[in-house]
């Protein structure tokens, strides 16, 4: 769900970020680790070749772009869609999900479902039914945009349904289980561990961390 937006036409590749200032959020969390990894893998030193300007909230980073105080930002959805509608000349320069896949060979993970092992084992049939419903929900989110957007507004996920409906196709909402899920998560955890072992509790998770189904 991460994208680099630019008010201009100078950034068409990760390498084009050299010498630029990027406003973003998430220092010490996923956005920073993802950005640093993608920059490094493309030959851009995140400590010397670019300036990373972090803010605590995406709204703060967006306000810098809106005020003309920054021209490049890395933002998540739905802030990207909101920004594109509010800032004349702003465009999506890089899809960081695609850039991650190019260098990592797996999908970028930004959200997961977790469950207590004892609860799953106590009633596997009930958990399987829940997973079927969860899968159907993901499919609905990607195909029934109008109703999904209405729910986003109803439950306070996004302020306006119209904004949610525009943003949903670019939110990369997927349902992964089994080996595919494990592969993507292991790649992601390895990147986090290399950046800061404490970000994953000091060690990589064992095989029993993952639900095989």
Where are these regions (language model features)?
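Extracytoplasmic/periplasmic, Sec-exported soluble proteins
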Residues: 9, 14, 23-31, 53, ...
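Well-formed, non-transmembrane alpha-helical positions, independent of function
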Residues: 16, 63-64, 82, 167, ...
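Secondary-structure end/capping motifs
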Residues: 120-195
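Pocket-lining segment of extracytoplasmic ligand-binding domains
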Residues: 57-152
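Conserved C-terminal helix/tail region of periplasmic/extracytoplasmic solute-binding proteins
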Residues: 186-213
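Short, glycine-/small- and polar/acidic-enriched structural segments
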Residues: 1-44, 53, 71, 77, ...
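Residues that flank catalytic or metal-binding motifs in active/ligand-binding sites
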Residues: 18, 109-111, 188, 205
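A local structural motif
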Residues: 40-56, 60, 64, 69-71, ...
């Amino acid at each position: 769900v991460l994208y680099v937006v630019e008010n201009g036409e100078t950034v068409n590749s990760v390498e084009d970020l050299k010498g630029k200032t990027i406003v973003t959020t998430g220092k010490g969390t996923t956005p920073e680790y993802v950005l640093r990894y993608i920059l490094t893998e493309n030959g851009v030193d995140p400590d010397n070749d670019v300036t990373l300007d972090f803010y605590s909230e995406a709204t703060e980073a967006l306000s810098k772009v809106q005020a003309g105080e920054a021209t490049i930002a890395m933002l998540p959805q739905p802030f990207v869609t909101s920004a594109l509608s509010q800032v004349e000349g702003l465009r999506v320069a890089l899809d960081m999900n695609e850039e991650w896949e190019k260098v990592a060979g797996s999908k970028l993970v930004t959200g997961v479902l977790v469950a207590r092992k004892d609860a799953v084992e106590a009633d596997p049939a009930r958990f399987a039914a829940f997973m079927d419903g969860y899968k159907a929900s993901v499919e609905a989110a990607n195909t029934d945009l109008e109703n999904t957007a209405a729910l986003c507004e109803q439950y306070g996920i996004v302020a306006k349904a119209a904004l949610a409906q525009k943003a949903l196709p670019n939110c990369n909402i997927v349902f992964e289980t089994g080996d595919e899920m494990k592969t993507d998560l292991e790649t992601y955890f390895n990147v986090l561990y290399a950046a800061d072992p404490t970000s994953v509790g000091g060690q990589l998770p064992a095989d029993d961390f993952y639900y095989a189904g």
